[in-house]
Amino acid sequence: MAEEYIIVNPSDDKSIDVIFRILRKCGYNLAKKGLFHWIPSYSRRAIKKDCETKTVVLVHDDEVKEYTSTFQMYVNKEGNLYVRKIATLPQFEGRGIGGRNLRFMEDFARQNGCKKICLDVYIRSKGAIGFYRHHGFVEIGEKRSIRFKELIMEKRLI
């Protein structure tokens, strides 16, 4: 499959709406599995604000001619790439999209001089934790957010 990685501009309301729908669908899908950390949905206003301060990516699959996933990235104060709001629509899970998105993130990190990619994952999201482990991420700690506990993971880039 060939993906197009679109960096979303804060004035691109159409793309922001697509991201909102992807995050909402993923949140509902997680809730069906007993994982409620993405309910309520992330707002359009919050996504727009993120587009001003982070690299917000919308992924279009050229083969199926649909938007399949989204994620956000920024270089944190330690000089590492921090990724968040990583979501692939449920109907596209298991097709390698997540792995290809991680490779895009790794390339972006290297281009920006980062030595690590960092992320936080809901501690009960066993599927996501296993996915990140499979792709070379290791747990380095835990933290408490406002509503739940998160596992801090990182991947060192060679």
Language-model regions: role of each:
Residues 109-120:
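Conserved GNAT acetyl-CoA-binding A-motif
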